[in-house]
């Protein structure tokens, strides 16, 4: 028995139209799949942690406990932790044996070496090319062109949280170069 075209129970699509739809749909799916990573690349990542901050972590990736940290570090010390963006960041122990309100990114502004704290000279000295920074991270001797980047350090619930420093650099009185 022959069916009439245009009846409501039979779709009005031939083989050629179906194959065109299938080909176009597949090509569109592949194109969108390839476009997704490109679009994601241009969208900035969301800040991790609480309120845009990151909890300081030790070398093993564990959260640093302030009470344990202060028991192990003397006043006026600087100790490395994992900070913003996973960069090594110094936690500052103040003269009154409390955590400072800022942390210092330990990456040298000359060539990106990690700058160790020299406690005997009370400054940071880069092992790569000899750049020196005072105890606040301000550059005092080149070839490094800029001071170490700052991060806010706040203590809550026995944890240290680093957040981005966006206001004026207290060491130079200028806008921060790292924002």
Curated annotation (Swiss-Prot):
Which cofactors, if any, are listed as required? [2Fe-2S] cluster
Q: Carries keyword Iron?
A: yes
Kindly indicate whether the keyword DNA repair belongs to this entry: no
Q: InterPro entries recorded for this chain? A: Cyt_b6_f_Rieske, Rieske_2Fe-2S, Rieske_2Fe-2S_sf, Rieske_Fe-S_prot, Rieske_Fe-S_prot_C
List the transmembrane segments: 21-43
Residues forming the Rieske domain are: 61-162
Q: Name one GO molecular function term.
A: plastoquinol--plastocyanin reductase activity
Entry membrane topology? Single-pass membrane protein
| Textual note on the cofactor | Binds 1 [2Fe-2S] cluster per subunit.
Disulfide bridges in this chain: 113-128
Question: What keywords sit in the KW lines?
Answer: 2Fe-2S, Disulfide bond, Electron transport, Iron, Iron-sulfur, Membrane, Metal-binding, Thylakoid, Translocase, Transmembrane, Transmembrane helix, Transport
Q: EC number(s) of the enzyme? A: 7.1.1.6
Chain positions recorded as [2Fe-2S] cluster binding sites:
108, 110, 126, 129
Give the GO terms filed under biological process for this record.
photosynthesis
Q: Name one GO cellular component term.
A: plasma membrane-derived thylakoid membrane
What is the main EC category here?
translocase
Q: CDD domains, per this entry?
A: Rieske_cytochrome_b6f
Record field: catalytic activity: 2 oxidized [plastocyanin] + a plastoquinol + 2 H(+)(in) = 2 reduced [plastocyanin] + a plastoquinone + 4 H(+)(out)
The cross-references to Gene3D superfamilies, in alphabetical order and at most eight, read: Rieske [2Fe-2S] iron-sulphur domain, Single helix bin
Its localization reads: Cellular thylakoid membrane
What does the record note on quaternary structure?
A: The 4 large subunits of the cytochrome b6-f complex are cytochrome b6, subunit IV (17 kDa polypeptide, PetD), cytochrome f and the Rieske protein, while the 4 small subunits are PetG, PetL, PetM and PetN. The complex functions as a dimer.
Query: What is the role of this chain?
Result: Component of the cytochrome b6-f complex, which mediates electron transfer between photosystem II (PSII) and photosystem I (PSI), cyclic electron flow around PSI, and state transitions.
Task: Give additional notes from the record.
Answer: The Rieske iron-sulfur protein is a high potential 2Fe-2S protein.
Q: Which family does the entry's similarity section mention? A: Belongs to the Rieske iron-sulfur protein family.
Q: What is this protein called?
A: Cytochrome b6-f complex iron-sulfur subunit
Q: Which organism does this sequence originate in?
A: Cyanothece sp. (strain PCC 7425 / ATCC 29141)
């Amino acid at each position: 028995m022959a069916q009439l075209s245009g009846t409501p129970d039979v779709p009005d699509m031939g083989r050629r139209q179906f194959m065109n739809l299938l080909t176009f749909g597949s090509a569109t799916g592949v194109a969108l799949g390839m476009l997704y990573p490109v679009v994601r690349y241009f969208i900035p990542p969301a800040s991790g942690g609480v309120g845009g901050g990151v909890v300081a972590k030790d070398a093993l990736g564990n959260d640093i406990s302030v009470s344990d940290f202060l028991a192990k570090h003397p006043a006026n010390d600087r100790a490395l932790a994992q900070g913003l963006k996973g960069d090594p960041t110094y936690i500052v122990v103040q003269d009154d044996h409390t955590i400072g309100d800022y942390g210092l990114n330990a990456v040298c502004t000359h060539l990106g070496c990690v700058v160790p704290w020299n406690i005997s000279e009370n400054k940071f000295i880069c092992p790569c090319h000899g750049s020196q920074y005072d105890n606040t991270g301000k550059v005092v001797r080149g070839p490094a062109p800029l001071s170490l980047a700052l991060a806010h350090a706040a203590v809550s619930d026995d944890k240290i949280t680093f957040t981005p420093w966006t206001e004026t650099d207290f060491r130079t009185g200028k806008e921060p170069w790292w924002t």
